[in-house]
Amino acid sequence: MTMKIASAEFSRGIKGTDAILADGVPEVAFVGRSNVGKSSLINSLVNRKDLVKTSNLPGKTTEINFFSINNKKCYFVDLPGYGYAKRSPKEKESIEKLILWYLMYSEAPIAKAVLILDVKAGMTDFDREMVRVLREHDHPLVIVANKADKLNQKEMSAQLRAIKEAAHEAVVVQYSATTATHKERDALLRIIFED
């Protein structure tokens, strides 16, 4: 499915598993550690600066947020970040359970999982575990090495090589949510929406 994004709007946010939005509309799940730029990436893809609230402080997204794309042709699903050390143990556990429940047990029709990494940090143990979960549940996966504008070409090549080795054959794309051109954005959308 190739898609040009003509409209994007907030649909709903959920904190509990009983309120999951599973209405048969295909979902693209954006997942990753806290502060890797998930919200900024979604804003970049829909070509808006303000659809998804962003913050420089990690751990601000604490619910699963659904955004209707092209009048419910699909949803972009912004999941809370995992691995944020400054959350209380109870809050951390609650958020991680919510993420895993959505990915492993909900009836959500996940068309693609987009795992966002901070290219500078590379793939962490948390990210490797997420790749394992996504593969075990047969979610088609693309890995976005975000914040590509923060590295020079030599550093970028080394980081991409290491990420690809750890990615177990998943497609890996370098990207910068803050500096991406229309061409780069359209190329990433094609990868996300291809079957």
What does each model-found stretch correspond to?
Residues 97-171:
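Conserved C-terminal guanine-recognition region of P-loop GTPase G domains, centered on the G4
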Residues 45-49, 103, 167, 192:
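Hydrophobic aliphatic residues
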